[in-house]
């Protein structure tokens, strides 16, 4: 069980829920980072009293320093600030809940400082999964998944031999537009896409869930986290979001993890593993459950999932290009610069233009990330 934590991305959805869990569990918070929401960060500082905080830029750091005069708290900014947050000497676990590839370098930095990782930033493994897992093994660092699906798989694998696993089954809600055709999707607005039927999440991941890119990123994450081949990872649409994922074994047995669709549950487990602690979260009532149904994902209509599979098949830097293009396209959609279906179109065009490096180092991945963002922006303009 974690005793002292640092959090990068403390003002986002996962960060806020992590602090709630830490408060309930009596876990000390050593350091926090946020991008621009310094009003909320200030409130978090007053409540949790970290030693160090970091914000997105120097102007925000100056404002934060003025607000926190007399508290004896070190205020930092940028990537260097996030590095200082994750390397805090007292913290034994770092919760990485920033959105996108902004979490990659701080996560690797934390691993190299031998901090256990509660991983909510799936883009870290999407873009640099092999490097991250090799670093974790070399530094004897444990990576605990925070995503509900990967937390479920983690639990379903416990006590079983890896060679006896036949396949991992990732469940997906199907998002708010399940069953719609491409023509109907063309007119979807950001407001409509931000209404997820089951989960309460941040804007970017909610759009990713609507396009099914989130599930595609989770497939790539699962490949590295659980060291599985692509053909042993299946996606099933499960609209009720009660079964969070499953593992099928060679004898035909299937182990599933069920629970209410509440992110606080996997967050708490990532902090307390191998223990389970009491809480006041809603418990699953089987007598009130709707019928549990399953269907194949429509990868022709929701092309992002197909593109994610393709990027993993190609390998190398292609997943990094896919991820970066997606981040730019989603941001453009949220700002009404492109339509819903143009998210996938933009990603596909970036992938078609990318010259893949099959054996990249970290610097190569960062370079591709920058290239893909620039290319996506040019396509959108």
Curated annotation (Swiss-Prot):
Pfam families: DXP_redisom_C, DXP_reductoisom, DXPR_C. NADPH binds at residues 11-14, 37, 121, 123, 202. The keyword Metal-binding applies. It comes from the Bacteria. Keywords: Isoprene biosynthesis, Manganese, Metal-binding, NADP, Oxidoreductase. 1-deoxy-D-xylulose 5-phosphate binds at residues 122, 148-149, 173, 196, 209, 214-215, 218. Pathway: Isoprenoid biosynthesis; isopentenyl diphosphate biosynthesis via DXP pathway; isopentenyl diphosphate from 1-deoxy-D-xylulose 5-phosphate: step 1/6. Mn(2+) binds at residues 147, 149, 218. GO terms for molecular function: 1-deoxy-D-xylulose-5-phosphate reductoisomerase activity; manganese ion binding; NADPH binding. Its cofactor is Mg(2+); Mn(2+). Its EC number is 1.1.1.267. One of its GO terms (biological process) is isopentenyl diphosphate biosynthetic process, methylerythritol 4-phosphate pathway involved in terpenoid biosynthetic process. It catalyses: 2-C-methyl-D-erythritol 4-phosphate + NADP(+) = 1-deoxy-D-xylulose 5-phosphate + NADPH + H(+). Belongs to the DXR family. Catalyzes the NADPH-dependent rearrangement and reduction of 1-deoxy-D-xylulose-5-phosphate (DXP) to 2-C-methyl-D-erythritol 4-phosphate (MEP). This is 1-deoxy-D-xylulose 5-phosphate reductoisomerase. It comes from Ruminiclostridium cellulolyticum (strain ATCC 35319 / DSM 5812 / JCM 6584 / H10).
């Amino acid at each position: 069980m974690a005793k002292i934590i640092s959090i990068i991305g403390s003002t986002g959805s996962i960060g806020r829920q992590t602090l709630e869990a830490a408060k309930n569990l009596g876990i000390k918070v050593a350091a926090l980072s946020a991008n621009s929401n310094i009003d909320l960060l200030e409130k978090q500082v007053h409540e949790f009293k970290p030693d160090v905080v970091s914000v997105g830029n120097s102007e925000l750091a100056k404002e934060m320093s003025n607000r926190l005069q007399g508290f004896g708290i070190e205020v930092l900014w940028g990537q260097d600030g996030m590095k200082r947050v994750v390397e805090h000497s007292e913290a034994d676990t770092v919760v990485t809940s920033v959105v996108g590839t902004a979490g990659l370098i701080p996560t690797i930095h934390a691993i190299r400082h031998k901090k256990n990782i509660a991983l909510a930033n799936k883009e870290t493994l999407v873009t640099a999964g092999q490097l991250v897992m090799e670093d974790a093994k070399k530094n004897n660092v444990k990576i605990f998944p925070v995503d509900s699906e990967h937390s479920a798989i983690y639990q379903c694998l416990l006590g079983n031999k890896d060679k006896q696993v036949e396949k991992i089954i990732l469940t997906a809600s199907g998002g708010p537009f399940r069953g719609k055709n491409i023509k109907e999707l063309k007119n979807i607005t950001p407001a409509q896409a931000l209404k997820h039927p089951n989960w309460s999440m941040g804007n970017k991941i909610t759009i990713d869930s609507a396009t099914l890119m989130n599930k595609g990123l989770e497939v790539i994450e699962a490949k590295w986290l659980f060291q599985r081949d692509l053909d042993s990872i299946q996606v099933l649409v499960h609209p009720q979001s009660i079964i969070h994922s499953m593992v099928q074994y060679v004898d035909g047995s299937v182990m599933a993890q069920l629970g209410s669709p509440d992110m606080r549950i996997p967050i708490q487990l990532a902090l307390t593993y191998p223990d389970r602690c009491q809480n006041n979260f809603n418990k699953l009532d089987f007598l009130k459950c709707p019928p549990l149904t399953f269907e194949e994902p429509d990868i022709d209509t929701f092309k992002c999932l197909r593109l994610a599979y393709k990027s993993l098949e190609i390998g190398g830097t292609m997943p990094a290009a896919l991820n970066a293009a997606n981040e730019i396209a989603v941001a453009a959609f949220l700002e009404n610069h492109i339509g819903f279906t143009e998210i996938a179109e933009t990603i596909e065009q970036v992938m078609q233009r990318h010259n893949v490096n099959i054996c990249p180092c970290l610097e190569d991945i960062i370079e591709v990330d920058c290239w893909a963002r620039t290319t996506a922006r040019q396509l959108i303009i």
